[in-house]
Amino acid sequence: MMLSNFGSYNRFFVKCMDGSLGLQELPDNSVKLVYGSPPYPNAVRDYGTWRSKDYVKRIAPFIDAAKVKLREDGFLVINVKACREKHGSKMNSTRSLVVEKLAILMEEEWALHCVDIEVWVKSNPVTTGLRVACQDAYEQILWFAKSNPWSINLDAIRRSYSETSLKTYDSSYYKPRSNGLTYVRKQKKIQPNPLGALPKNVVSGPVSSKRVKHQAVQPEYLPNKYILATTNEGDLVVDPWMGTGTTGVEALKLGRLFAGFDVVQEYVNIAEKRLAEVPMVLKLDNTGV
């Protein structure tokens, strides 16, 4: 299938290849969201090891390609975990700042706009046996927009109000200022939003327990949030580090199109099977993307 016609008759396209090259095969300005979790710094995996000293250099081709392929209203979201650096047997390991460096470069070198740097707090982190710092229980999510101003679907990711918040609303009022310059001239009760509370920039939940042949399977709720927040039905979502296809499964469930790439053929085969099993939500036509 020609990628230039992607979306005409297919909900998804996956291929075993380097994701930066896969992105280059997509039409320019066609992608609404590039979401993915690249290899973590220094993590030894069957799909390779990206050393922290070379990390920015390794990820640069992906960001270069993403910027060209993203629509002007598109977003790039990267979930990545920092690592600890070893400094010899007589010194303590230190936390690497490579993720922070990457975030700064995404703004300064790639001229992307930081929507937020969110945090994924894991309720069941893997025990590391670390004795020189606290248990590592979070990962960072670098959320950037191609253009500013940007628009996100906050209503799609609102959350339920806590009992404490609802009690606060019951006793809270807008009070008029004595100078009369505020738009509230009379005392007025504050009402909670009927769609729910504003989403937090902290995502909490367990690490995926799915029995899939992959060393770092994403939980569904992570890509789900950013797909809902940044895309609409029929938009194209791309994961250049697809793994076994969790991002794609969530995209298809929500009626989006999906393209994914991975360098391990076994993962691509698993992803293709999982994606094919997702029930049809989006009605396709022959317009393409």
Ranges and model annotations:
Residues 1-270:
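Core catalytic lobe of class I
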Residues 1-9, 272-287:
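Short, conserved SAM-binding/catalytic segment
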Residues 154-158, 282-289:
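Short, flexible loop/turn segments with low-complexity composition
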